[in-house]
Amino acid sequence: MDLKSLIRDVPDFPKPGILFRDLTTLLQNQAGLRYVIDQLVEKHANAGIDYVAGIESRGFIFGAPLAYRLGAGFIPLRKPGKLCAPVYAVEYELEYGRDRLEMHQDAIEPGRRVLIVDDLIATGGTAAAAAGLIQKAQAELYGFAFIVELTDLAGRQKLPDVPITTLVTY
């Protein structure tokens, strides 16, 4: 399936000079959404994944059905202040400032195998922070799964040496 044909390009969003890859059009397409989840399941079905950790917010959209299909639990990796119990937190650099990801401290037992999922990898900062959360929990980072990779931004170079799955590259 040609996933690129299901992804809308939005020029100058969120600011001039940026070409935004809008996956909402992919999500609206029943066959496209099914194909994405089926592809991710096929690539990770035999990996012994205990948990899928989805990065807020579009990682939730793809991560939860993937976890269900893999027979794994789902862990939301949230922006600051969204979780109600004690958290692990990792700060990371943005183009203009800093941000933080958080995860409940009791979300993952040490040694459990985790796949991190997000819709897109660009510079890799958010995904690297997500990996830091898994490390703080003393769990095993199995790998990453992204629908889209923006290769010019070299985000995968910031990530640990684990399997990285992408379905579409630009």
Curated annotation (Swiss-Prot):
Lineage per the UniProt record: Bacteria, Bacillati, Cyanobacteriota, Cyanophyceae, Acaryochloridales
Name this protein carries in UniProt: Adenine phosphoribosyltransferase
SUPFAM superfamilies: PRTase-like
GO cellular component, one term: cytoplasm
Protein's pathway: Purine metabolism; AMP biosynthesis via salvage pathway; AMP from adenine: step 1/1
Subcellular location: Cytoplasm
UniProt KW keywords: Cytoplasm, Glycosyltransferase, Purine salvage, Transferase
Species: Thermosynechococcus vestitus (strain NIES-2133 / IAM M-273 / BP-1)
Catalytic activity, EC: 2.4.2.7
InterPro entries: Ade_phspho_trans (IPR005764), PRibTrfase_dom (IPR000836), PRTase-like (IPR029057), UPRTase/APRTase (IPR050054)
Keyword Transferase: yes
Reactions accelerated catalytically: AMP + diphosphate = 5-phospho-alpha-D-ribose 1-diphosphate + adenine
